[in-house]
Curated annotation (Swiss-Prot):
Name used for this protein in its record: 3-methyl-2-oxobutanoate hydroxymethyltransferase
Cited InterPro entries: Pantoate_hydroxy_MeTrfase, Pyrv/PenolPyrv_kinase-like_dom, Pyrv_kinase-like_dom_sf
UniProt-recorded Gene Ontology molecular function terms: 3-methyl-2-oxobutanoate hydroxymethyltransferase activity; magnesium ion binding
Enzymatic class: transferase
Amino acid sequence: MGRLTLTKLQKMKRQGEKITMLTAYDASFAALLEAAGVEVLLVGDSLGMVIQGQESTLSVTMDDMVYHCRNVSRGSQCTFILSDMPFMSYATPNQAMDNAARLMREGGAQMVKLEGGRLLGEIVEHLTARGIPVCAHLGLLPQSVHRIGGYRVQGREEISARRIQEDAMILQEAGADMLILECVPARLGSKITDALKIPVISCGAGPYCDGQVLVLYDMLGISPGKSPSFSRNFLEGTSNIPNAIQAYVSAVKKNEFPLLELSY
């Protein structure tokens, strides 16, 4: 049995089956997540904060991402592996291609994720034309935290919401095969999910998207500092980590997480 494919994830969207995704950074947790039925492992540059103790994701390097992606690949057999491309690793089409190829060839990633809107259209086209699947990332962009003035909800104003939706359509047209929406109002998450053919995964974008993703350490209630308001500590009330992961998967599949009243 091989790894879950992009074709299967697209089929899940069409059939209305929720996609479960969690971040993973090492082989041991990758194995636990796979055993619990998580479909997608996101090797996130959030490792800069939860693994390395940095204040943001900006210091994470390509070598860091390849290292952790390789470990996650070794620890899993069937899950789909998505890897972040770190800050300034995709400034030009050729740089993006070289770095994405490293993540796939050396790290075992099946797809790479880029943060940003319509200006990334050329880079998305460049990658997908060369057989590299791309996940777009809109809404709150952690790699742009200094430009936007902190970790704030995006798309609350009509102009901002319209631009995010337009960006989503443009990136889909450019070839993106998946989209993560972070910290936007639930109504905007619903609107974009309905408008796109590709799977849309919510990270604080409400319950109406095609799937959900959380930072693993937030989901277990062990992240340093305060977890996002839309998150939930699934370890609370369960006896161990495997049960907490299974509770997350079950809650997403049954539309019991996230709660609309805790969405933006």
